[in-house]
Amino acid sequence: MGEMVERVDEQDHTLGVVDRGEAIRRRWLHRVATTVCRDPDGRILVHRRPDHVSRFPGQYNWLVGGAVGVGETYPAAASRELAEELGVHAPTRFLFKYLCRGVISPYWLGLHEAVLNEPVVPDPSEVAWHAWLTPVELRVAMHDMTFVPDARDAFDRYQAEKAGSRGSLPRHSALPPRPERSP
């Protein structure tokens, strides 16, 4: 058996425990916890998935995360994923969750935020490349590079949440050299 998750309904109530692969194949709702990682200057961590992974190989993402395990909360899963994927232990702040219809399967997405004050040490089996981008640079990158399918919708929701809770994020005009895909 693979990774076990809780199958949930349209209100995010648990219906039972299933294999995540089966939940995806049958398009059953389950939970995913993600974190937007920011540095003290407000830049956002962007990473490229390795070419060998089964879902979205070689594509970029601005969120770190994964499935919420059986009996696990969204925040606990977000913290676990930060440690597994980036080798960091940082407090996460739950921002919101929403029902994401998803390209490969629908799921409840819990979005968190963390400010990382320590260097990241990505697991190469999870992260092939990473860089810190301003929100404006990230928006440009989403148009120029191939991001995981649900990234843009999540980013739009995140930006709306940030604008609604604290006003607009600072705008920066300088863009770094465009990250290149490895061959």
Per-region residue spans from a language model:
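A glycine-rich, hydrophobic loop/mini-helix early in the fold
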Residues: 32-62, 66
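Residues immediately flanking
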Residues: 10, 49, 135
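Active-site segment of metal-dependent pyrophosphate-handling enzymes
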Residues: 27, 31, 51, 73-75, ...
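Short, well-ordered strand-loop elements centered on a beta-strand within folded domains, enriched
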Residues: 14-17, 42-48, 119-123
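Nudix hydrolase/Nudix homology domain
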Residues: 19-21, 58-60, 70, 96-99, ...
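Glycine-rich adenosyl-nucleotide cofactor-binding module
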Residues: 59, 63-64, 70, 75, ...
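Acidic, metal-coordinating catalytic segment for phosphate/diphosphate chemistry
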Residues: 1-34, 40
